[in-house]
Amino acid sequence: MRKQIFLSSVLLLGAALTMSAAERGGRTVALAGVEYSVDTLFHAKVGPGTTETSLHLVNETGQQLRVFYLTTDLTNPNTSIEAIVAQDKVPGGGTVSSMAKSHTVEGKNYFCGVNTDFFHTSGSASNGKSIVGAPVRASVAGGEIYRSGSASTSWPNIFVDRDGKMNIGAVSFENGTVTVGGKTATLKAINNDAPDNGISIYTPKYYGTPNQPWINGQCVTVPVTLEEGDYVGAGKTLKFKVCGATGTNGDCAINDGEYVLLARGSAKDLLSGLKVGDEVSAYV
């Protein structure tokens, strides 16, 4: 949607009066070999250590671009960068301003932000629940993994490390393990399509189902619980307890407060013999 709005703006503004960069005066910048004049429309402090800037760019043919950006001093003790999820679950969406308002609490005020990732704009899961707003790629907020990235691509992510530094790069979610009785399999996905020869975790914040009917009969699933207040996060060791019988449906139900472990290929044997009360350890 953002791309469509931007392109519409270019088309509507393309009929503006044209003039050379020299005639327009001021600063210029070259983008993809095209020279634009630059005019600063707005620059002000909008929060602790943070300024917002709005730029207006015009080239010789009259095409115009608008640029909005924030600059933040991360050494300011009153400012930090955090990721939040609109509805605190995988599906569902919201505007940046509504997300800031709904997540602001006493002692923590979200005063600016940017939208990230592409998300589903239509569709339903196999149980009929909407998947609108669900991120297409990885999503991690507050240390909790809402969705892992796809194993089939090295799509880059933007993330903040433990030192508060911004990073952009590919992130692998296939470095974890799942252990039962001393035997181990690779943890390959969280709230995403299950790769072969590994185990995937589906949380109460997903669609209410692993949503993969095409692997019915080709997988092993088991419902489990996690200690109340715990969550699936990178670098954590989780202790699950089996709370129901195993199954073979890739679109089984995820009951309220429960998780589902799903194994494919060589990892199926690890889950197939589990019974109610058995414990499963996972390192994420």
Name what the model sees in each region:
Residues 122, 282-283:
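Residue-level recognition of conserved beta-strand edge/terminus positions
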Residues 1-25:
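Bacterial Sec-dependent N-terminal signal peptides
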Residues 269-273:
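Short, conserved secondary-structure segments in the cores of folded domains
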Residues 274-281:
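Loop/turn positions that initiate beta-strands
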Residues 22-256:
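Zymogen propeptides
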